[in-house]
Amino acid sequence: VGEKGAGETLLNGGSEQAGTNIEPVEEITAAGNGNLTIVLYFGNEEGYLTAEKRVIPKTPGVARAAMNELIKGPTAQSGLYATIPPGTRLMDIKIEDGLATVDFSEAIKSKHPGGSAGESLTIGSIVNTLTQFPTVQKVQILVEGRVVETLAGHLDISKPLERQAGIIRPNPGTF
């Protein structure tokens, strides 16, 4: 089975289903043994984001750890799709006055598969993963330390972004 990229998520097309919008999962909990449960957002087969809970070692830099886990991609058994292009590295992350400034390597742009829906999932996965933390209300995405207008030519990311709950759906493969 090949790896699934952000662009592949949307080839099947998505459909707007009334009543399927769920509240964002805001659950950062102690998992015991010095671990923490965080929520990561990945693409699903319908072209929306779906939450995947992941247990990580408790760390003071939990937002940094969450971004590194997001870059790793979803677990194989989740049936979800990676939203961050392969080869992308987290350069830096800072949180100040409710704003998370997250800086990625050039690969997030240069290796992005493109498409407005794929770009939306990439941005949404970053923003929604970071805004689960109570200290983060907005997210500014940088590439190699610079503010950029867009990742793949469709969506403006030159200004801080807020949580995007409208693109979160439960995993269609679960009941």
Predicted regions: what they are:
Residues V1-F175:
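Bimodal "functional hotspot" detector
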